[in-house]
């Protein structure tokens, strides 16, 4: 019996592919690897574009006990049962989903929270540490964050100095001492703060807040432009794209306790 030879059309369909076969285990092939390219900027919502869907943690500190509200797309077990911090509106699903929005409970040091990492100065400059690796307590950070979050209803520079000082539990004498600090450590010690009070910030944000005005903005510029020019410059600080992409929204960044402190130090010179 003679061998059966396939037609040219069939032969074209059974040729070997140009790329080698992936012999990695399926679990490895399906593992999500984040891209190494810089993460694109999240568009700022307007009245016409609507609200973008991404992770938001607003720092509310209502004490709650119970299990972690997990990702709705995750089938794995819920593994957090300790007392947790309650944060509002964990935005993961699109607004059209029947379960959106839902109040969620998340620990402050959850690895999906922007407050999970703290910039710490090391021998080689700033580095990131997880909040659960720090020895000092963070108990005083959350009340300050909660009170400062009230300034999100309006621009923080529109509030009086007394209101900003009250949110930080800061006295005028402390402000005088804070204005003379030239290092982050000295400023934290003056406020009786710990490294946890830098939670959520990037090293570039910390450097911007510690500078005697930025290179782009001076006190005279603010008098000519708008009082919010310094805050606008904070948003435009180039951050390292290699760090985790989860970060603070502009309102969260503007009302961060350390940012409010930096504004008070500079605006009252």
From Swiss-Prot:
<feature type="region of interest" description="Disordered">
    <location>
        <begin position="1"/>
        <end position="23"/>
    </location>
</feature>
<comment type="similarity">
    <text>Belongs to the aquareoviridae NS4 protein family.</text>
</comment>
<protein>
    <recommendedName>
        <fullName>Non-structural protein 4</fullName>
    </recommendedName>
</protein>
């Amino acid at each position: 019996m003679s061998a059966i030879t396939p037609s040219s059309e069939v032969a074209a369909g059974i040729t070997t592919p140009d790329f080698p076969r992936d012999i990695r285990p399926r679990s490895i092939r399906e593992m999500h690897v984040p891209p190494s390219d810089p993460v694109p900027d999240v568009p700022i919502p307007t009245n016409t574009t609507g609200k973008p869907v991404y992770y938001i943690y607003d720092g509310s500190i209502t004490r709650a006990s119970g299990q972690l509200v997990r990702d709705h797309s995750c089938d794995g077990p819920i593994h957090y049962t300790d007392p947790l911090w309650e944060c509002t509106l964990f935005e993961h699903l699109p607004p059209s989903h029947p379960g959106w929005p839902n109040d969620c409970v998340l620990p402050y040091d959850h690895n999906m929270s922007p407050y999970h990492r703290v910039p710490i100065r090391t021998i080689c400059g700033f580095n990131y540490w997880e909040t659960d690796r720090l020895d000092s307590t963070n108990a005083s950070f959350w009340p300050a964050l909660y009170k400062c979050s009230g300034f999100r209803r309006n621009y923080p520079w529109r509030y009086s100095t007394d209101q900003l000082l009250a949110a930080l539990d800061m006295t005028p004498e402390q402000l005088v001492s804070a204005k003379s600090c030239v290092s982050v450590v000295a400023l934290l010690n003056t406020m009786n703060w710990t490294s946890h009070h830098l939670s959520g910030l990037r090293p570039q944000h910390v450097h911007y807040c510690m500078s005697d005005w930025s290179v782009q903005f001076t006190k005279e510029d603010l008098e000519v432009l708008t009082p919010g020019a310094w805050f606008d410059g904070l948003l435009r600080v180039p951050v390292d794209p290699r760090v985790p992409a989860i970060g603070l929204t502009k309102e969260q960044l503007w009302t961060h306790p350390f940012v409010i402190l930096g504004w008070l130090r500079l605006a009252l010179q």
